[in-house]
Amino acid sequence: MAPNKPSVKGKSSSKGDSKTGKPLSSASKVNKKNVKRPPPKEVKSKARTESSLLKKTKKREYTEEELGLPKLNMITPVGVVKPKGKKKGKVFVDDQEGMMTILAMVNAEQEGHIESKLQKARQMEEIREARRKEAEARLAQKKSKLDDAKESIRQKKKRKGGSSEDSAADTSAAASGAKSKGKRKSVSFA
């Protein structure tokens, strides 16, 4: 036999203690392995070709009254309550003549828009023509000034025509004066 540890006086062995103390909690519980359960029930799936699965279920069809849809393109008589989804600017006409007058007013307004566009186009064309004429007038004025200057120079030449040196000097002076006005000084940085 195996040697036992010497027991200390005053203390009892642990084996005796366990029996006299609290009862084991595992004894009161039922072991999960020992419990017998009924076998799981097999769920039988039906074949896809079975007639009950192939049948289409009927969906409920709602009437127009149940849905509360307004009737479209209808002339609502006087005294009839307007539908709940009324748009802004919607005009309810009580008779055919009233509807025709409203239609005529709308058409006239649209024609007015078209006429105003045509009128604007005409005005713009007139403005373009006026600008063209002004530009042509300016060019003609410049040409006339240039021609006048040329004529004045020619007249001066004809008056002084006696001395050739003076006329040469005058023409060179006139040319230098014209060049000085036309030519501008330019500065270049190297």
Swiss-Prot record:
Residues 115-161 form a coiled coil. InterPro entries: Loc1. Disulfide bonds: none annotated. GO terms for molecular function: mRNA binding. The keyword Nucleotide-binding does not apply. The keyword Nucleus applies. One of its GO terms (biological process) is ribosomal large subunit biogenesis. Residues 180-190 have a biased composition (Basic residues). Residues 39-49, 114-154 have a biased composition (Basic and acidic residues). It is found in: Nucleus, Nucleolus. Residues 1-13, 164-179 have a biased composition (Low complexity). Keywords: Coiled coil, mRNA transport, Nucleus, Ribosome biogenesis, Transport. Belongs to the LOC1 family. Required for efficient assembly and nuclear export of the 60S ribosomal subunit. This is 60S ribosomal subunit assembly/export protein loc1. The lineage of its organism: Eukaryota, Fungi, Dikarya, Ascomycota, Pezizomycotina.
